[in-house]
Amino acid sequence: MAFRSAPRGDYLWVPDDRIWAIGSALMLLGSILFVGSLIGNPALPAPGADVVAKKPVHGVFHITRHPMMWGFALWAIVHALVAPYPASFAFTGGMLILALGGSAGQDKKKAALMGAAWADWSARTHFMPFGAQLSGKAPWKTAWPGLTLVLIGIIVWLGITYVHPM
């Protein structure tokens, strides 16, 4: 409600087709990360998370240790790019800070709660998306989360795109 009531302000740039295309691709990646984060995620508040953290890295966790939060961060960035006005920046900036700051805070909290299990998980995953691949810690083929997750991510992305007002 507060966002809708805030004075909009002028657009700082006109989002052209290139921005919309890049934004759509990033929204799709964010959707895939979000969907994948719901499967075998030791960061979720669940009993036995330490057992999950000891399992082999799988799916989107090869891309980042915090796929849900990076999905939210990508969504925030895209919304700022396609709606570049002050009220939008306040809203999406808050979402971005919450997503990335929350991820960093979650690393500290899980390290305290899970000890060696989280330390091991953190050593086998990377905070930054594609950080393991870019640093040479993991081969690029591990960045493919699997056909099922990609297809479900596409369905989620299409569904949200269909119902989302522009």
Show where each model-derived region lies.
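Membrane-anchoring alpha-helices and their flanking helix-loop junctions
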Residues: M1-R65, W70-M166
